[in-house]
Regions:
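FIC/Doc superfamily catalytic core
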Residues: 1-175, 179-306
Length: 306
């Protein structure tokens, strides 16, 4: 894992340099608010597209064609991200109460009776062999988890990744466990000077498989490799995004037609994959046209092998 750690530190330094420009910070914050809401919710089955997520967050625009809760999830996630950003800037203590605050925001207006409260019933993860703790054990497990969170450690990157795993494994809530765990992860990363990890919907199966391997076989290697790779890819996405705002924006990112040519597939195929949610632009021009990174060619190759 040392090689990927080195790449992460290199890209972290590049991003930090770009973020010295206040305009770049504003661009990134706005993009992350939508991107994290879209990806984290999509992993849990939310049906909104990226554009619909953005419209719900920025304009509060909804459509009767999709469940109202899908829109509320987008808005709530954006609020939760703003909460963890503010908390990270103030170095707010990350403990049990902090996690409950995140969860309360996530389920606000959707399930107020359970928002910010631990589950009182048994739950299971559909399709998983993981056995989740008895609800009677949850309060004590969360207190132990909170005490561990408050311990200072040298490697806060690995601690943040481990914290995500531990919270998902305790599964303290009736709903919203994954979203809350990913927000906790990213809160810890932000406080430690890293960027958030974006887990793409296309990687959902690998993500859940790596988690289950850790939970059922006590083999953490696939999970840590997956999360570190996701962080490095996320950093590169953010760097590419900010490159759009340089003097030569088209130098690093490609229009849909140029990206289709690079991948040797018809433009219509790229558009179809976008519609199906299998492929997403990494950024958008001021006119709303999608832009792709050359590295996304690997995503296309993966889709073609499905």
């Amino acid at each position: 894992m040392q090689e990927i750690r080195s790449k992460i530190e290199e890209n972290k330094a590049i991003l930090q340099k770009l973020l010295k420009n206040k305009d770049n910070q504003k661009v990134l914050d706005k993009w992350l608010k939508t991107e994290l809401a879209y990806t984290s919710n999509a992993i849990e089955g939310n049906t909104l597209t990226r554009k619909e997520t953005e419209m719900a967050i920025e304009e509060r625009i909804t459509s009767g064609a999709k469940p109202i809760n899908d829109y509320l999830e987008a808005i709530n996630h954006a609020k939760a991200f703003e909460f963890i950003q503010t908390s990270a800037a103030k170095a707010v203590k990350i403990d049990e109460n902090y996690i409950l605050q995140i969860h309360k925001i996530i389920l606000s207006g959707i399930d107020d009776g359970n928002a910010g409260f631990y589950r009182s019933v048994r739950v299971r993860i559909s399709g998983s062999q993981t056995i989740l703790p008895n609800p009677l054990k949850v309060p004590d497990l969360m207190k132990e988890f909170s005490a561990w969170l408050l311990q200072k450690e040298d490697d806060m990157l690995l601690k943040a990744i481990e914290a995500h795993y531990r919270l998902v494994t305790i599964h303290p809530f009736i709903d919203g466990n994954g979203r809350t765990a990913r927000l906790l992860l990213n809160s810890m990363l932000l406080e430690s000077g890293y960027a958030p990890i974006i887990i793409r919907p296309i990687d959902r199966k690998r993500y859940l498989s790596a988690l289950e391997t850790y939970q059922t076989r006590e083999n953490s290697e696939p999970y840590y490799k997956f999360m570190l790779s996701a962080l490095n890819r996320s950093l590169k996405m953010m760097i590419d995004l900010l490159d759009v705002h340089k003097q030569e924006p088209n130098k690093s990112l490609l229009t849909i037609s140029k990206f289709a040519k690079l991948c040797d597939v018809p433009t219509s195929t790229i558009r179809y994959w976008m519609k199906e949610g299998k492929l997403r632009p990494i950024a958008f021009t001021p006119s709303g046209y999608g832009l792709f990174a050359q590295e996304q060619k690997a995503e296309v190759q993966k889709i073609m092998m499905e």
